[in-house]
Amino acid sequence: MSLQMIVENVKLAREYALLGNYDSAMVYYQGVLDQMNKYLYSVKDTHLRQKWQQVWQEINVEAKQVKDIMKTLESFKLDITSLQAAQHELPAAEGEVWSLPVPVERRPLPGPRKRQSSQHSDPKPHSNRPSTVVRAHRPSPQNLHNDRGKAVRSREKKEQSKGREEKNKLPAAVTEPEANKFDGTGYDKDLVEALERDIISQNPNVRWYDIADLVEAKKLLQEAVVLPMWMPEFFKGIRRPWKGVLMVGPPGTGKTLLAKAVATECKTTFFNVSSSTLTSKYRGESEKLVRLLFEMARFYSPATIFIDEIDSICSRRGTSEEHEASRRMKAELLVQMDGVGGASENDDPSKMVMVLAATNFPWDIDEALRRRLEKRIYIPLPSAKGREELLRISLRELELADDVNLASIAENMEGYSGADITNVCRDASLMAMRRRIEGLTPEEIRNLSREAMHMPTTMEDFEMALKKISKSVSAADIERYEKWIVEFGSC
């Protein structure tokens, strides 16, 4: 036995398998496996032996696959033969049914004699004739079962054909939205899928009433997004919808929350875009992503593109820290925003594409982008009334003690942002639990009942939380925002 023989047998086995001659292939595979087993006993080197064992396992897997194919083919043959046998049996069974009505003894008997005999001797012929008729037309139980089976099968076939017709009608209505799918010809498939993942299909479930205060910002967003779809005949020409809205303000004032409310309430295709979506390490891919984003937005219009922290994407151009790739991406973004195929070009407000942006650093944004974001609104810190309303929204699921005065708490929170107020409410709601488990072992904590843990939040809890949590926005920051909005604002 030589290695050359093993190699030749493996080649023959694979060739026979490819040609569909699985029986011959299995013979060669089995011979190769036996030859390799004999060869393995003669190999002394452990490293070489491991390699041969690995090869043996691979060929064994191939042999198993061929064996599975043979089993599948055999099952097909069994099904065909059983069907053919059933078809051959059916005429024989039917022949037995119809052979009885034509007995040989009936032919020589003349009809008139039969009738006369029935008149003279009524009992005997009367008893014989029904017996022959019954024998002729009474099917056997097996044939009755077959006939019933045929009727049931024919009924099932009719129901299945009706079901198929209904199914064929249903997908036309159900899959009609799926047919309206963006054609990404000319773009990388991964880029298209990455941007499709940024389309918010799930409802963020944030309503306008979930946002305290910010009445002017809500009105502007409704005017920019909702009203053009309700009154398309009005928003034409100089009254065209706003192409871009920039929300400016300190952190934690509700800019991203407003964007979530737009996605929930406005019923437009909502693209949630960040710097990671539009940047790539490959040359020229960032510009393609920007162009693809706006083409998809035009296709799925009316659409809203929300760019959070837009200062990180489109900062001021011409600085020494700017890279060439970043500059090209900014240029493409500016071109696409100015040429958005929405109401400004098509005079169709229902096909608009609006860019909604948010930033904490408006002074770092490029001047050309600032011009394209036509409405620049200030999202300030909540007022006293807004703070009280935000407290009610945050604490609506909690049980409060009778001594809690939300108006007094709101007055003590002057200068706090919306996020700061939420943190105070969260910390105050945990105070009662902290007092309850103080000094207890882990086992005792696990055995506490739900009623023991759900205790009302008191005024003292809020006072302690206010001492622990300070405001996150300084007066100097507020002054800087107000100065910028006075100079560049467009409310």
From Swiss-Prot:
Binding site for ATP: 249-256
EC number: 5.6.1.1
SMART domains recorded: AAA
UniProt region (Interaction with dynein and NDEL1), positions on chain: 1-75
Classification of source organism: Eukaryota, Metazoa, Chordata, Craniata, Vertebrata
Ranges for region Interaction with microtubules: 1-185
Pfam entry (one): AAA_lid_3
Superkingdom in the source lineage: Eukaryota
Protein activity control: ATPase activity is stimulated by microtubules, which promote homooligomerization. ATP-dependent microtubule severing is stimulated by interaction with KATNB1.
Chain's gene name: Katna1
Record localization: Cytoplasm; Midbody; Cytoplasm, Cytoskeleton, Microtubule organizing center, Centrosome; Cytoplasm, Cytoskeleton, Spindle pole
Any single GO BP term: microtubule bundle formation
Protein task: Catalytic subunit of a complex which severs microtubules in an ATP-dependent manner. Microtubule severing may promote rapid reorganization of cellular microtubule arrays and the release of microtubules from the centrosome following nucleation. Microtubule release from the mitotic spindle poles may allow depolymerization of the microtubule end proximal to the spindle pole, leading to poleward microtubule flux and poleward motion of chromosome.
Protein family according to the UniProt entry: Belongs to the AAA ATPase family. Katanin p60 subunit A1 subfamily.
Mod. after translation: Phosphorylation by DYRK2 triggers ubiquitination and subsequent degradation. Ubiquitinated by the BCR(KLHL42) E3 ubiquitin ligase complex, leading to its proteasomal degradation. Ubiquitinated by the EDVP E3 ligase complex and subsequently targeted for proteasomal degradation.
This protein's name: Katanin p60 ATPase-containing subunit A1
Recorded domain comment: The N-terminus is sufficient for interaction with microtubules, although high affinity binding to microtubules also requires an intact C-terminal domain and ATP, which promotes oligomerization.
Region (Disordered): 101-182
UniProt keyword terms in alphabetical order: ATP-binding, Cell cycle, Cell division, Cytoplasm, Cytoskeleton, Isomerase, Microtubule, Mitosis, Nucleotide-binding, Phosphoprotein, Ubl conjugation
